[in-house]
Amino acid sequence: VVTMTSYAPLLAKEGHTQWNPDLIYFNNTEVKPTVGYYAQQMYGQNAGSEYIASSVTLDNAQDAVKKRIGVSVVRDGKTGDMIVKLVNLLPVAVNAQVELLSLEGMNTTAVKTVLAGKPTDQQVRPVSGTMEVSEKFGYELPAYSFTVIRINKNEK
């Protein structure tokens, strides 16, 4: 289990770098987080502390497709939230059926955050919204994307 990550170099002044990628660029007037920064931020804010068994069925069962789709479902021990993370490394969207064991005590409206764009895109930013979820729900993973679906625990 990975609890921390280290990214080097973290900061780099534009025009004064030895290699690419760096995590955050800056110049004399602005700070420019990279796409990698946002991906690390999304993982860090949604790490979870307990793995939850789940299954995902794809509309395409080819091995080449399955190897490029990543899924993780965890629970945040502090908040009780369930966190579904989906990665699509393919250049096309993929339809998935997500099956969770139980949503008992959870809201059916979740917060979805998506980071999507071509691998060469440098201006991609996470986009958040809401979506309805159930114990079994369909979701279209955009091409080249990382999606976090955070299902909040019901407040009593």
Which residues make up each language-model segment?
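Composition- and surface-driven signal marking solvent-exposed, interaction-prone regions
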Residues: 19-26, 86-87, 95-101, 111-113
